[in-house]
């Protein structure tokens, strides 16, 4: 993880690491009910679980994000290996949600490193006092990765449904335990940056307008993608799936959408 942070944000959130899984998603209909799909399912599921476990032992912010990326790529491959309509929808939505939230986190870590001289999460104590606006950007990015009602949780909800409908309880267990494992490192990160320490001086003066523009744009994109995900699904994902599978239907029931809408309202309040 020695590349400049903007390069890491570009390569490890939305371009290089997504190139391979993009091809696997394109092959998703052909992977259903065969040995290649079964291998992809279990390799992806095991990768998701063990990469999540590996992230717990890391304190370098970029390494935590790197292992988290590997974990989510494993989940995408696992969903694509199932080959079902619901699993394909889930894989595509994970790609979208992950791209914006993880880009925000990589750039936030880079900005913190520039101001603090370190990207070690253990040294992020009191970031809320020293750089409150940057801290807010990090909170939004972390929330986008694992908290309700942000995008990744929506995708994992849909993944659970896809695994159950496909009759793969072992994959469901890997998803549940792997998702539970992510709580450890994201909660640790949140606890560090939200801790309040008296007497710290403000350090945001050195952050340029260009950096703020990028961070705030990605923060709003993380929120907007979550709120507008039904429209993204209806006008972006479902037309592709209609061409690929020949039919469309709702992956997440209307009642669940209402629950998620209430979560958004409570979050705003």
What name fits each language-model region?
Residues 1-206, 216, 227:
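Hydrophobic transmembrane alpha-helices and their helix-loop junctions in integral membrane proteins
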């Amino acid at each position: 993880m020695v590349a400049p942070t903007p390069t890491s944000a570009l390569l490890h959130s939305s371009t290089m690491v997504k190139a391979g899984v993009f091809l696997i998603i394109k092959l998703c209909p052909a992977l259903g009910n065969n040995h290649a799909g079964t291998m992809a399912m279990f390799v992806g599921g095991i990768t998701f679980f063990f990469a999540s476990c590996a992230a717990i032992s890391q304190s370098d912010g970029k390494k935590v994000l790197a292992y988290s990326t590997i974990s989510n790529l494993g989940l995408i491959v696992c969903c694509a290996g199932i080959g079902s309509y619901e699993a394909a929808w889930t894989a595509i939505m994970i790609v979208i949600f992950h791209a914006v939230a993880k880009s925000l986190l990589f750039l936030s870590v880079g900005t913190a490193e520039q101001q603090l001289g370190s990207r070690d999460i253990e040294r992020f104590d009191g970031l809320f006092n020293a750089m409150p606006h940057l801290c807010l950007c990090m909170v939004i990015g972390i929330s986008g990765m694992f908290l309700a009602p942000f995008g990744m949780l929506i995708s994992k909800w849909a993944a659970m449904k896809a695994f159950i409908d496909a009759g793969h309880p072992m994959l469901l267990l890997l998803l549940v335990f792997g998702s539970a494992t992510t709580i450890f490192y994201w909660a640790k990160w949140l606890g560090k940056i939200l801790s309040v320490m008296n007497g710290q001086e403000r350090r945001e003066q050195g952050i340029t307008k260009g950096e703020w523009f990028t961070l705030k744009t990605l923060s709003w994109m993380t929120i907007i993608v979550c709120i507008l995900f039904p429209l993204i699904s209806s006008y972006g994902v479902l037309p592709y799936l209609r061409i690929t599978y020949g039919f469309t239907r709702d992956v997440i029931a209307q009642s669940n959408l209402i629950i998620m809408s209430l979560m958004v309202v409570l979050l705003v309040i």
